[in-house]
Amino acid sequence: MTNLTDLGIAAIRDGVARGDFTATEVATAFNAAVEAAQPALNAFIVTTPEEALEAAGKVDADRTAGRPLGKMAGVPIGMKDLFATRGTQTTAASKILEGFMPEYESTVSQKLWDAGAGMLGKLNLDQFAMGSSNETSAFGNVISPWRRPGDTAPLAPGGSSGGSSSAVAARIAPAATGTDTGGSIRQPAAFTGISGIKPTYGRCSRWGIVAFASSLDQAGPMARDVADCAIMLEAMAGFDPKDSTSLDMPVPEWTANLDPDMRGKKVGIPREYRLDGMDPDVARSWEDGIAWLKDAGAEIVEISLPHTKYALPTYYIIAPAEASSNLARYDGVRYGLRDLPEGAGLQDMYAATRAAGFGPEVKRRILIGTYVLSAGFYDAYYTQAQKVRTLISHDFTNAFREVDVILAPTAPSSAFALGEKSADPLEMYLNDVFSVPASLAGLPAMSVPAGLDRNGLPLGLQVIGRAFDEQGVLNAGLALEQRARFSARPAKWW
């Protein structure tokens, strides 16, 4: 019999529906895999084996009774610890929220439970989703299941959704939720050889997700392949009146309309993404992707996104500005950590709580954000950044008059070793160079594994689409997936 932990969403759901195995057997297998891997990978902050089994039991009972099963029936997933889960600790990987038990469920997680999914646990991440390597978590680094051949140095799983990427790549979860503000689904997916999609801004509700940068944050799925991402995204997406930025649009049937035939489609190759000193393996992978989409029938068109060079500085003004505003609410009064020095007044308590609760990277971004929003600098920085953001969005609008999707690398390199870049925040921020532009424009974008580099580590290719055209992104992703035939898995060392 196939090892149940080798199965993805579609295989589990369909196998449970056919009676090949029970949802309880699947949950039991993944619970055991999580327990075995957690000490080495640290992918989870909290594990919830009982919740996975309870959800599985309901699915098995529904099947026995002949009741209809949901899109995710019998699939146990990892939930990024940015999503509020009723009665289960939600921390955003920060000490300031340690022990916080929400009395409500995020819209996205509730939709997944309604579709028949169960929860294996809350996944580790960069603190408040601020980071590209999962080194800023207050609960320890997540370790990638991948290693360079002959080398035991622990590698970064990407970030901020590093717990999600590590768990899916290590086969201890068939899928996981992620959030993407400037690349936090796509970059970790690329680093670990899995697929992940950031949908159009507003496609998935932000209600109940701990906010980082509210005009950028978007939830999405991370899974073994493109089809599994489509299935999970259908379950996650949908209008939510509790989120003022939610799109009041029906959820398309992305899975039923998956089609890798690219005939009649034009694929844009942005010349500004060809950076000086680009990693030769990344450049080769990009050329492979161009050839694969051409083979699938697409016409390749070189395009220009002239304001690309301003995307990173624009992002690192807007995102910290929004973060400094969002994180002002954490004061130790109603929930989470409270640091109350003896004889302290209210303002002293605020300062002590925030000093003890926030990590260095979060403090750095709060300081940057507060600075660019201050009276003397607001127009010089924040207002200018918003103007440039509009120009970047217009670049994409103009490009999509000529082409249907855009192909680019997901990240400028494969996974790096933990500690390799953490001493230099600016070097770490450069990891987002290919992913940030689509985020600023609110466009759907996904990463698909494309092969291995010279060190035997995964590389990802990124497909960017028009707003609301997740179907076009998924279809191009499927065309790449079928031609890349990526089947490499990390050698098990944990």
From Swiss-Prot:
GO terms for cellular component: glutamyl-tRNA(Gln) amidotransferase complex. The keyword ATP-binding applies. One of its GO terms (biological process) is translation. GO terms for molecular function: ATP binding; glutaminyl-tRNA synthase (glutamine-hydrolyzing) activity. Its EC number is 6.3.5.7. The active site is at 80 (charge relay system), 160 (charge relay system), 184 (acyl-ester intermediate). It holds the Pfam family Amidase. It is an enzyme of class 6 (ligase). Residues 140-168 are annotated as: Disordered. The keyword Endoplasmic reticulum does not apply. It catalyses: L-glutamyl-tRNA(Gln) + L-glutamine + ATP + H2O = L-glutaminyl-tRNA(Gln) + L-glutamate + ADP + phosphate + H(+). Keywords: ATP-binding, Ligase, Nucleotide-binding, Protein biosynthesis. Allows the formation of correctly charged Gln-tRNA(Gln) through the transamidation of misacylated Glu-tRNA(Gln) in organisms which lack glutaminyl-tRNA synthetase. The reaction takes place in the presence of glutamine and ATP through an activated gamma-phospho-Glu-tRNA(Gln). Heterotrimer of A, B and C subunits. Belongs to the amidase family. GatA subfamily. This is Glutamyl-tRNA(Gln) amidotransferase subunit A. It comes from Novosphingobium aromaticivorans (strain ATCC 700278 / DSM 12444 / CCUG 56034 / CIP 105152 / NBRC 16084 / F199). The lineage of its organism: Bacteria, Pseudomonadati, Pseudomonadota, Alphaproteobacteria, Sphingomonadales.
